[in-house]
Amino acid sequence: IDRKIYTYKFRKACENADKIIAISECTKRDIIRYFNIPDDKIEVVYQGCDVSFTHPVTEEKKEEVRKKYQLPDHYILNVGSIEERKNILAAVQALPMLPQHIHIVIVGRRTGYTEKVEQFIKDNGLGERVHIISNVPFNDLPAFYQLAEIFVYPSRFEGFGIPIIEALYSGTPVVAATGSCLEEAGGPDSIYVNPDDITGLAGAF
C-alpha cells in the first residue's frame, strides 16, 4: 500500500511540476519510462560530494585512522549501507581469487543482508580478510578512501552513486557495476563489470 501511495504522489508531482530535476540520465529515463513524462520537462543535474574529499588527508590523520580501525595495509574499499541491491557480496565472493594480502573493508550501516555476507565469509575462511565497520564518523571517511587501493561499488541499482564521486576526488581507482547510472558517475576512466560476473570483478581488481 505504501508503495502505491508513493507512486501515486510521485506521478502527480511529476505531472504538476513545471520542471523536474533528475540526478542522472538513468533516473531521467526511468521517469519517462514509468511515468510517461515528456523528455523536455526533465533536466539532469549531477550531484557532487562534500569538499572534504577533494583535499589530501595528512599522513598523521591517515595513520590515526589506520590504527583506530585496525585497517590492513592493502585493501579494497566499499562505502554504503550493506543491503541486497548494493551487492557487496559479489566483491567478497571475488576475494578468494585475489592475492592473500588483499583485504576488503566495508563501511556502512548493517541490515539483514549483512548476515548473508557474513555467512559467506565464515564458510570460506575469509574472516581475517574482510572487515565490516559501522558508525564511522564523517571526518574519518576521507582517510578511508585515500588509504584504499581500489574503491568497489557493485550495486545493481542507484539513482547516481555519490560514493564513486568521493572515491574519484580522493584519487582512488573505481570498479563499479554496469546496468544503472554508475557509468555516469564514474566516467570513462573507471572500470565497469556486470554485477553478476564474479570472475570479471576479480579480474578488474
Each language-model region and where it sits:
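Carbohydrate transferase catalytic cores enriched for Leloir-type hexosyltransferases
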Residues: 1-205
